[in-house]
């Protein structure tokens, strides 16, 4: 009786082995601790990755914002630097005075002897010409006459010249007849020197009329432009400081 029972059990085991693929497999319950740990680990890992991604994105936005601000600041500073370095086309009165104070030139435009320059205290070219015609005759044909007011007018109306605006301010303030003699200190002589340099050459004979009005202008002209050979002084102005100054060096000619 035991032998048939053993055979039945063995047969049942073989059948079970075939059904299960030859080896028994271990199956975990639905709520196995291992499964719970795996699910929790996966969720926790995903959360950590999300937080890490947020932390990476936030500094990136801040960096972009800071770069934009820094770029704007650099651009503004660059524009300001260009404005400062950009050549000025006009000068104010204060700026001109600073330029004059900074001038260190000690060499005249025309060394002594290159040109023959004379002053005349007569108020116009016509009057000076008439007086000299009587005393010198045809010799005045070689002379070139310069009226400082006309020189200043030339630069006042010279478009885009750096002194155009400033000269027009004085023109409006003092009028066409006297504004040239009310310019900032040194400006009249400076513009005369510029005009001489642009228009005259070695060997020319020149007479500057209605000039100088002060000893300061006289000495400045001789230091910056050229030495003067003579000054023509109407008799009514023979007592002026300018006449007395040139009398001390034997260059005054009373007419």
UniProtKB/Swiss-Prot annotation:
Null allele phenotype: Increases frequency of mitochondrial genome loss.
Membrane topology of this protein: Single-pass membrane protein
Top-level taxon of origin: Eukaryota
Organelle transit peptide residues: 1-40
Annotated compartments: Mitochondrion membrane
Keyword Transit peptide: yes
Keywords: Membrane, Mitochondrion, Transit peptide, Transmembrane, Transmembrane helix
Transmembrane domains' residue ranges: 64-82
Miscellaneous note of the record: Present with 1710 molecules/cell in log phase SD medium.
Record-given protein name: Altered inheritance of mitochondria protein 36, mitochondrial
UniProt lineage: Eukaryota, Fungi, Dikarya, Ascomycota, Saccharomycotina
